[in-house]
C-alpha cells in the first residue's frame, strides 16, 4: 500500500495561513468612538527593504507595507515583538514584446511558437522553492492558485502540462526560429548574419532580480544573446509602459502586480492581462504606438466584462476560453504567486487580514492602533517615485501613491475581504433586473450626456435596459469633503459628465486617447440616469450577472472622491489651456506635465487656473442643469464658496488632494520620502473605527484524508473531511502521474457533515493502468473567495 499527501504546486492552506488568529476577532475595541479612524495620525516613511526588519525591531516604524524579502521574514518568525501577516498579495509575470522587428532584424517574441515555448523554459518550481524558499506558488494563468476562479480553469492548467521542460522548449524555439529564417551559429541564433539580441529589463528591488537572472540564463542556453538591464521601479515602468513597442527599448520585463481585494467572480483581470482593449497589453492603446491586437479575445472579453452570458455555466465557459486563448498567445508568462509577508509590531491591534491583500487592504489602517498611542508609522519601500503621479483622473496608478490614497478616499462599494463579493461601503443600492433575456423600460425622462450638444439629453421613448440600480448616496451627500464643503449630487454629475465627455467629445478623445478608447465599451452599456432626490439616483444599464451585487458594482456612477471644482479646473488645464495632461502617454506626446496635485509646481498651476476661473465667474452650468429641472443642482454663488474653500486648502496644506475618507493628507514631502495623514474627525463622517473592523477569516482545512491504494477492477472510494466556514464543496481531478493526463474529474459526493467522497466504479478502475495516480483536490466555501488545494498520490495495482 502506498499513500502520500503532497502539495499541488504548494500547500495553499499554508500559503494563506497567517501567524495571527485563524478566526475573526470579536473583542476589538478601538481607542475612540469619534468619527474617523482609530488613530489621529498616520506617518508614511520610506525604509530600505533590506534594513526594514532592523528598523521595525528598533521601533522606527509600526508596520512595513512593502513585502519583506523571504530570508528576512523567516528571521522574524521567532521574534515575539513582531507579528507576521502573510497573504498571496503579489504575483509575478514576464511580459513579452510581440512587435514585428524592422526589416533585416528578427524579434523572437513576435513568433507565437517562441512565446509559447517560454512557458516551459521558465522553471517556476525553482522560483517558488529556491528563490522564494517555499513562500511562493507556481502560477500558469492570471489566476493565482488561491483564487476562487482557479477552480474554473484548474483542469485546463493540468491539461496544458506547462511543467519546466527546457529541452522541449529549446526544440520548439529552434523549429520556430529556423522557420523564420534564423540560423544557430556556434550556439547563438543569428539572423542575416547578426546575432539575435534580447533586451531584458529586470527589476532590482526584490527577488525579481534573481528571477530575472534565472530567465536570462535560460534564454542564453536557448541560443539568444541577452542584454540584461537592471532597473528600479520608475525607469523600468517608463521604458516598458510609456514607449512604443516597435522602438524595442525592451523585449521582456519582470512584471510584479499587487492585489487590492479578493474577487469571487473575476472579469477584470482575465481581460486586462490577456485582451488588448483595456490598454494593458503591449501598445497600451496609445495612438501612434504599435498595438498587439486580438479581435477574438477583445470581443469575448467585452462580453464577459459586460455580463453578456446566460448563466454561471456560460460565464465560466467564456472565462475558460479566454484563459486558453491567453495561453495560446502567451504574451504574458505567469511565474508565481508570492506569499508576501508583512511585518507589524507586536503591540499593534485591529488588523484585518484581507484574503488577497493581507493587511495592505482597504481596512487595516482605518482600524489599527497601539495602546496608549494616537499615531502609527507605516514604512514602505518608497513614498514617492518619479512615476508617483497624484491626479484622480489618470494617476494614482502605482502602489506607492495608491497605498496612501486608499486611506484618504472612500469607495462607494468594495469587495468583502473574505467573500470577495461587492458590498455597500458608503452607498446602498437596490437592484432590479430582467436579465439575462428580458429588458426593462427606461423612463423617457432619463438622461445621458450628449457630447455633441454639450448638454444632458433625455433618452426619449422606447429605450430599454437589462437592469436598473437605485443608489442611495446619503452617507456621501450628508457628509463633507476634507475642505469642509458638503458632498452633493453636483459632484456625482460632474464625475459622470467628465467620463462621458472625455470619451465622446472628439477634441478631448484626441488628447486623452487611451482613456477614451478603453472607457467607451463600458460607457456604451449605460442607457440612462435619473436623479430621484438629493440623495438617490437611478442607473439603467445593459448588464446582467447571476449575483446582483456585481450588477450594482458595474453600474456605480461615482465614488465622488474629488470635489467637482477641482475636476473642472483640471479639465480646463488639460483640454482648454493644454498645459497639463491626465495620462503619462498624453503628457509625453504633447510635452506637458503629467499633472500631480501633490507637487508644488503642479498644484500652483491648478491654483492659478482656479483663481482665473473664479475671477471670471466661470461655472459649468450645463453640467448641473438637468432636462426639465426647475433649478440647477448648484449655482454660481455655491461655486464661489467651493473655489474659496479649495484655494484656502492649498494655502493651508500646499497641495490639492481633497477627498472624502477617514484621513486627510496633512503633509507630503517627496524629497524626504514622507507623508502625514491626519484623522478626519468631521462629525458628518459616517463611520467610526468599530464600524470597519473585519478581523481574520477562518480558512478551509483538510481535517482528515482516507485515500488508500486502488485495486484494479474493484470499486474505489476515497473520503475527505473538511473544516471551514459556510457551505463547503470539493472538486477533484484524477491524473495519471506518468502522462499528466486527466482520467476523471467532477464534484466529490457529500457524505455527511463536511465529509466528501470520490468514487470510481469497477469498470473505471479496470480501465486504469498499473502505476501512480494523483487526486488533485480543490475545496471551496460560499463564504470565502479562495480555495484550498491538496494532492494525494495513489498507487493502482492488482491488490
Across the structure, where does each feature detected by a protein language model lie?
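Append "and occasionally in soluble cytosolic enzymes with long acidic Gly/Pro-rich linkers
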Residues: 110-217, 321, 366, 374-379, ...
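Long, low-complexity, polar/charged, intrinsically disordered or flexibly structured peripheral segments
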Residues: 427-472, 579-656, 661
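Ligand-site clamp/hinge motif
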Residues: 30-74, 225, 478, 651, ...
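Extracytoplasmic/peripheral linker and loop segments enriched in polar/acidic and small residues
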Residues: 116, 128, 227-237, 266-345, ...
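Local pocket/hinge segments that shape ligand/substrate recognition
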Residues: 35-36, 68, 73-172, 190-194, ...
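Surface-exposed, Gly/Pro/Thr- and Asp/Glu-enriched linker/hinge segments
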Residues: 24-40, 78-79, 108, 187-192, ...
Amino acid at each position: 500500500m502506498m499513500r502520500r499527501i503532497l502539495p499541488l504546486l504548494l500547500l495553499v492552506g499554508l500559503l494563506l495561513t497567517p501567524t495571527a488568529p485563524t478566526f475573526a476577532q470579536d473583542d476589538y475595541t478601538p481607542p475612540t468612538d469619534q468619527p474617523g479612524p482609530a488613530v489621529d495620525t498616520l506617518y508614511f516613511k520610506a525604509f530600505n527593504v533590506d534594513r526594514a526588519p532592523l528598523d521595525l525591531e528598533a521601533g522606527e516604524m509600526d508596520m512595513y507595507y512593502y513585502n519583506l524579502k523571504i530570508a528576512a521574514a523567516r528571521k522574524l518568525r521567532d521574534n515575539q515583538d513582531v507579528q507576521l501577516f502573510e497573504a498571496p498579495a503579489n504575483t509575478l509575470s514576464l511580459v513579452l514584446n510581440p512587435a514585428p522587428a524592422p526589416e533585416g532584424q528578427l524579434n523572437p517574441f513576435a513568433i507565437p511558437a517562441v512565446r509559447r515555448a517560454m512557458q516551459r523554459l521558465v522553471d517556476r518550481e525553482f522560483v517558488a522553492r529556491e528563490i522564494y524558499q517555499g513562500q511562493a506558488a507556481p502560477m500558469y494563468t492570471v489566476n493565482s492558485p488561491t483564487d476562487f476562479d482557479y477552480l474554473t480553469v484548474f483542469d485546463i492548467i493540468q491539461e496544458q502540462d506547462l511543467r519546466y521542460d527546457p529541452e522541449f522548449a529549446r526544440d520548439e524555439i529552434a523549429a520556430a526560429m529556423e522557420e523564420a529564417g534564423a540560423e544557430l551559429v556556434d550556439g547563438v541564433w543569428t539572423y542575416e548574419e547578426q546575432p539575435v539580441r534580447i533586451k531584458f529589463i529586470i527589476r532590482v528591488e526584490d527577488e525579481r532580480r534573481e528571477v530575472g537572472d534565472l530567465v536570462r540564463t535560460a534564454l542564453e542556453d536557448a541560443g539568444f544573446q541577452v542584454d540584461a538591464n537592471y532597473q528600479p521601479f520608475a525607469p523600468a515602468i517608463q521604458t516598458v509602459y510609456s514607449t512604443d513597442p516597435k522602438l524595442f527599448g525592451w523585449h521582456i520585463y519582470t512584471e510584479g502586480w499587487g492585489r487590492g481585494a479578493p474577487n469571487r467572480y473575476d472579469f477584470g483581470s482575465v481581460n486586462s492581462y490577456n485582451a488588448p482593449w483595456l490598454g494593458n497589453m503591449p501598445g497600451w492603446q496609445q495612438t501612434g504606438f504599435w498595438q498587439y491586437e486580438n479581435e477574438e479575445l477583445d470581443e469575448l472579453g467585452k462580453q464577459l466584462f459586460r455580463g453578456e452570458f446566460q448563466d454561471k455555466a456560460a460565464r465560466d465557459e467564456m472565462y475558460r476560453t479566454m484563459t486558453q486563448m491567453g495561453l495560446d498567445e502567451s504574451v504574458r508568462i505567469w511565474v508565481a504567486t508570492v506569499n508576501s509577508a508583512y511585518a507589524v509590531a507586536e503591540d499593534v491591534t485591529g488588523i484585518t487580514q484581507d484574503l488577497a491583500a493581507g493587511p495592505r487592504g482597504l481596512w487595516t489602517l482605518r482600524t489599527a492602533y497601539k495602546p496608549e498611542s494616537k499615531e502609527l508609522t507605516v514604512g514602505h519601500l518608497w513614498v514617492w517615485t518619479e512615476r508617483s503621479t497624484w491626479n484622480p483622473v489618470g494617476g494614482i496608478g502605482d502602489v506607492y501613491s495608491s497605498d496612501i490614497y486608499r486611506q484618504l478616499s472612500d469607495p462607494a462599494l468594495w469587495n468583502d475581504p473574505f467573500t470577495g463579493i461587492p458590498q455597500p461601503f458608503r452607498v446602498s443600492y437596490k437592484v432590479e433586473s430582467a436579465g439575462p433575456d428580458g429588458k426593462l423600460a427606461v423612463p423617457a425622462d432619463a438622461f445621458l450626456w450628449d457630447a455633441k450638444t454639450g448638454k444632458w439629453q433625455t433618452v426619449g421613448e422606447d429605450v430599454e435596459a437589462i437592469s436598473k440600480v437605485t443608489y442611495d448616496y446619503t452617507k456621501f451627500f450628508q457628509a463633507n469633503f476634507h475642505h469642509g464643503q458638503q458632498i452633493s449630487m453636483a459632484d456625482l454629475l460632474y464625475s459622470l459628465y467628465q467620463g462621458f465627455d472625455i470619451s465622446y467629445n472628439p477634441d478631448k478623445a484626441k488628447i486623452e486617447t487611451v482613456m477614451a478608447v478603453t472607457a467607451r465599451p463600458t460607457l456604451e452599456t449605460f442607457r440612462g440616469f435619473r436623479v430621484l432626490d438629493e440623495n438617490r439616483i437611478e442607473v439603467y444599464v445593459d448588464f446582467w450577472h447571476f449575483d446582483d451585487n456585481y450588477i450594482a458594482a458595474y453600474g456605480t456612477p461615482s465614488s465622488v472622491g474629488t470635489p467637482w471644482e477641482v475636476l473642472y479646473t483640471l479639465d480646463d488645464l488639460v483640454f482648454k489651456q493644454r498645459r497639463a495632461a491626465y495620462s503619462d502617454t498624453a503628457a509625453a506626446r504633447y510635452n506637458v506635465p503629467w499633472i500631480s496635485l501633490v507637487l508644488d509646481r503642479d498644484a500652483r498651476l491648478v491654483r492659478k487656473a482656479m483663481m482665473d476661473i473664479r475671477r471670471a465667474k466661470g461655472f459649468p452650468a450645463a453640467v448641473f442643469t438637468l432636462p426639465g429641472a426647475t433649478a440647477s443642482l448648484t449655482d454660481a454663488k455655491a461655486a464661489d464658496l467651493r473655489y474659496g474653500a479649495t484655494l484656502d486648502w492649498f494655502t493651508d496644506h500646499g497641495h490639492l488632494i481633497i477627498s472624502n475618507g477617514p484621513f486627510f493628507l496633512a503633509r507630503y514631502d517627496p524629497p524626504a520620502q514622507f507623508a502625514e495623514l491626519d484623522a478626519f474627525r468631521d462629525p458628518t463622517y459616517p463611520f467610526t473605527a468599530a464600524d470597519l473592523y473585519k478581523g481574520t477569516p477562518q480558512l478551509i482545512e483538510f481535517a482528515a484524508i482516507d485515500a488508500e491504494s486502488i485495486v484494479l477492477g474493484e470499486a474505489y472510494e476515497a473520503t475527505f473531511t473538511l473544516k471551514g466556514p459556510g457551505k463547503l464543496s470539493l472538486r477533484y481531478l484524477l491524473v495519471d502521474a506518468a502522462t499528466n493526463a486527466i482520467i476523471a474529474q467532477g464534484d466529490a459526493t457529500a457524505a455527511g457533515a463536511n465529509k466528501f467522497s470520490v468514487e470510481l466504479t469497477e469498470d473505471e478502475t479496470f480501465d486504469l493502468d498499473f502505476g501512480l495516480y494523483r487526486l488533485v483536490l480543490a475545496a471551496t466555501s460560499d463564504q470565502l473567495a479562495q480555495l484550498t488545494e491538496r494532492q494525494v498520490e495513489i498507487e493502482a495495482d492488482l491488490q
